[in-house]
Structures are given as C-alpha cells and as structure tokens.
Amino acid sequence: NIGVNSVFLARLFVYLHQFFEKKRNGTMQSGKIINDPVFGFINIPKGIIMEVVTHPTMQRLHRIKQLGLSSMVYPGAQHTRFQHSLGAFFLMTEAIQSLRGKGVEISDHEAEAVKLAILLHDVGHGPFSHVLENTLAPGVHHEEISLLLMKQMNRELDGRLDLAIRIYKDEYEKRFLHQLVSSQLDMDRLDYLRRDSFYTGVTEGNIGSAR
C-alpha cells in the first residue's frame, strides 16, 4: 500500500505541477484584470510584469499580512503584502500617466521598470511583516532582503530586471523615478495609508491619492 500511495502521490504532484504551469503560462500570455476593493480594477499586462506577479517569490506575499498581528485589535486587517504591492503598482501606473500628461519624458522601458520596482519593493518581508523583522535576521532590513531576492529573480529572468534594480537602488539618472518608489511621498505610502485605513476602519489614513 505504501508503494502504491507513493506512486499515486508522485503522479498527482506531476499532474498538478503541469496543470499550474500551463495555467501560469496562459495567464502570462494574455494578461489579467484584478478587482481590488480599494482601487477597483487593476490591469496586469502580459510580459515581464505578469511573469513577476505570478513568480513564486512574489506569490508568497499572499501569505504575509500587511499589518502583522494588528488583526488581534482590528479584526478587519486581514489584507496582505501582495494586495499592497498590487495597489502600489496601480498608483505607479496612474503616476506615470499623470507625469507624462504634464510633459515629463518617461520611456516605455522606464515606465515598465519603475512599475516592476514598486511591485517588488516589499518582496523581502518575512512572516508577520515588521513584527519579526529584527528577530529573524538582526540588523538586516527587509529592503536589503528585497534587493537580494530581486537579484535572484533577475538571474532567472535573464537580466530583464536590470533597470528596475537600478531604480530601486537610486542608481538611475532620472532620480525622480526612485522617489516614486521610496521617498516621503511615494506610491508605497499612498497605498498603505488608504489600504490600512480601509481594512482597519481607521479614517485618518484615508487620503485623496488621486490628487
């Protein structure tokens, strides 16, 4: 029986792996629209952005709560780092469109890269987000881990994250692109203020991000 069960489980594993790979590949070729409770429909275009969104390193953020243990006090705070990353991506898309409308020159490659940078900005978070950050790896901040994971993904993706990493590290000549990712008024903050406010019911963070 043990031998039969082992063969069955092995075949099941292979089948499920092939099934999800086909589904993932099909999604990457067609893109995806996600309905977000904070911002509404978010369009995930096919190509490198979809590859990053569906990558296992990114998908693990589904299981990491944005506010750690805050749900013990605010039961509605069940939202995840994955949701936050998509929200920040949406705001980055809006910001790029707004800047272009004001005459700021941003190439398609730069626009794609800065969207990738904001998508991956929190990929280094561990269990319970900030709660265990200094316990699991003392002296190492999640931004450093995010960069390490981005570099690993970049190797897997044949260097297609090169510009995104340069923007993330503030090594690209158009420094305002980095400021959209990390500054006193970036897409990260604009999303988590609204998102945390929405899910906790605390109105103080409900700012007008569209402005």
What is the role of each PLM region?
Residues 1, 5, 22-25:
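Polybasic, lysine-rich low-complexity intrinsically disordered segments
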